[in-house]
């Protein structure tokens, strides 16, 4: 790895430790030429996951899209950022556990709705209305009736 200060190609590791979440290793390095120190992070390289959209186009999985969609659905509701992050984590965990390289939006939506329903039913209906493309008030009423029947 090249030194960011002098571009010399050799360094020694001064300190190495796992990050808080255990997903990467933080290393303090010292350049063998200029003796300046810098930090690097080592992370496992993962295979990119493709999302198959409803129109059959494909795009790279983007966790931020899930978080942003949930933020909109949970706006002005008693749902914390931490809970939203946990739902996004659950989606990633599910995809990872099944070792999928491609996943359709339907599967992602189902995982989100299953988890969101446990946290806040109003946010769940909001999310479902966009995800399932509710066309009219009757569709909203049917979904609310289903929720009430299950409670």
UniProtKB/Swiss-Prot annotation:
It comes from the Bacteria. Binds 1 zinc ion. InterPro entries: ATP-cone_dom, NrdR-like_N, RNR_NrdR-like. Pfam families: ATP-cone (PF03477), Zn_ribbon_NrdR (PF22811). Keywords: ATP-binding, DNA-binding, Metal-binding, Nucleotide-binding, Repressor, Transcription, Transcription regulation, Zinc, Zinc-finger. Its cofactor is Zn(2+). A zinc finger (unnamed) spans 3-34. One of its GO terms (molecular function) is ATP binding. Residues 49-139 form the ATP-cone domain. One of its GO terms (biological process) is negative regulation of DNA-templated transcription. The lineage of its organism: Bacteria, Bacillati, Bacillota, Clostridia, Eubacteriales. NCBIfam families: transcriptional regulator NrdR. Belongs to the NrdR family. This is Transcriptional repressor NrdR. Negatively regulates transcription of bacterial ribonucleotide reductase nrd genes and operons by binding to NrdR-boxes.
